[in-house]
Amino acid sequence: MSEQLLDGVPLTALSGVGAAIAEKLGRIGIHNVQDLLFHLPMRYEDRTRVTPIADVRPESFATIEGFVQLAEVQFGRRPILSVTLSDGTSKIMLKFFNFNAGMKNSFVVGARVKAFGEVKRGRFMAEIHHPEYQVLRNNQPLTLAETLTPIYSTTEGLKQASLRKMTEQALAVLNNVKVAELLPDQYNPHQYSLKEALLLLHRPPPSISAEVLEKGEHPAQKRLIFEELLAHNLAMQQLRVGAKQQQAQALHYQTDLKARFLASLPFAPTGAQQRVVADIERDLAQASPMMRLVQGDVGSGKTLVAALAALLAIDNGKQVALMAPTEILAEQHANNFANWLRPFGIEVGWLAGKVKGKARTAQLEAIKNGEVQMIIGTHALFQESVVFHDLALVIIDEQHRFGVHQRLTLREKGAKADIYPHQLIMTATPIPRTLAMTVYADLDTSIIDELPPGRTPITTVVVSEDRRGEVVQRVYQACKNEQRQAYWVCTLIDESEVLEAQAAAAIAEDLQRALPDLRIGLVHGRMKPQEKQAIMAEFKAANLDLLVATTVIEVGVDVPNASLMIIENSERLGLAQLHQLRGRVGRGATASHCVLMYKPPLGKISSKRLQVMRDSQDGFYIAEKDLEIRGTGEILGTKQTGMAEFKVADLMRDRKMIPLVQRYAKQIIVENPPLAEALIKRWLGDRAEYTNA
């Protein structure tokens, strides 16, 4: 057996993986064979047996076999190929919305067909839309899968079949190389070796319930989850210990700048804002770096808190960097801060991908020589060409969009002669207390738990897709009769950006036909940042009535005149994302409304989630409910909630493991530092460098 370790086996060692495929795999965090094996299936399909048609159930997947009784093309808005199969127990209809003449001609009456797909309730009988199918010769033996079929999350240009072939080869490699078994028995409560767990989870025998696997409840999954949580906890503990030993500039107000700034505002800070600012000022007065997380619900006024933190550093002659996750949000911050700070002679600069040529060179020079005191940008702020004059405070907005590694890179950039900048992280994704201790174990936490006066409550209604016509009329009424603006959000989850962009464009066209008098704009993830910003600027300037968007508008867009939001397929989104999207309205003095449209029938979990949205606008309550609902079984990936980047763990689902993980992490840090390093390296890869920051 080879002594080579899995993370040393390149992807190109697998047949069929060249540079182009390796680049696509890299997009989803897969850089070597170990990464590929840690990319576990998000769900499984049981294709190991044929289900009699009489026994199929809506909203479940099934393999069926039957004979064609009828195949016809129905003509409407677009042609649909409908094929009726019978197996003697009952009938089922296969529907194809995209088909060609060859497909149609293969479904001759009497032909034997095997099909697999999700069963839906139809008008006359059960239906499967776009099934995978095979037309069989009458004497051809039926072949079925021997294990559950894994379904992996993927990216544009990577098909499920290709990923399965690659993992098949990776499993063969797994059998031939040594796998470092990092968890000694006393730290492995689940009694599976790493190799056993990986072999089982990529190709589970049909005796294991797909439902148990999808809930993350199988001991083989728990074995991997436990090790990953342990690695993250060890990394956070190392980080916190390291940070406390570093030096920072202690900051105290030198002038009356704060009082003059507050006097210039048309409103007074809320009690919660004042309390959080006091926490920050206390941290900034210390000679070790502040590492504070400020959680504020949507619209709670985090920007003002950030401005007051920045003022203290600037009053000491220092620079402040504020990093936002998108160019739209960075530009919005740049405008807000310029309006607030320039009257006091404070120069505000901004740096994003679209700042190019001479303007970029001039901005970089102004940052380097200290002419600009407040620098705002996207991740462009930590490119090597950016050199700060005297950076004392780093503010990161919407922490969940940045990995820990990124914010530490920015902190390293500010380090001079072993003096490190203070860090303030702001998030509008409220984190249940149970989880905050794990995700942000290296940070102190403050909460802004009060909304500024003048914010109007948002009325939320839940309506079926069947009432789409009424919803379109409501949009017309809001935009034309009430002179308001509206958002129409389209969602496609686990689909490619290309499909999402096409769907959004099609919806925008449909709405433009239905509402010819309205000025309609479109933004989606496939557009260049400049295009997105141009459309957003038009919307903000009220030159557009309706903005059709994908979930790219989730964070920080501020248009007070927008008072109506429609979210299509709302049942597909998690609570955190729904809450963020809804927070784009309710920012002015007019009563705002949010319409959550869903495709019936609505599952039990989706129904609970939409009810929580209808009943509450409190982000912390919604986060706790999210925890409860997910604990009942429907698991959405961690990435969607923006909690942290995990390969196999989901903090919501796996929170019961956390106390034991924390206990073991404390023991390992003290008793076995080399084991801590090995675990961190395996699960965090090059991101592990941040533990030495």
Report each predicted region and the residues it spans.
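Long, highly charged, low-complexity intrinsically disordered interaction regions
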Residues: M1-L14, E23-G26, A231-H232, G242
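Short boundary/loop segments of OB/S1/cold-shock single-stranded nucleic-acid-binding domains
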Residues: M42-A62
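Short, surface-exposed secondary-structure boundary micro-motifs
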Residues: F67, E118-V119, S570, R584
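Structural detector for short beta-strands of small beta-barrel domains
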Residues: P58-P79, G117
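Upstream accessory/linker segments immediately N-terminal to the RecA-like ATPase cores of bacterial MutS
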Residues: Q74-L265, T638
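Inter-lobe coupling/hinge segments of SF2-like helicase ATPases
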Residues: R275-A278, P289-Q611, Q667, E671-L675
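C-terminal accessory region of SF2 helicases/translocases
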Residues: A589, P601-A693
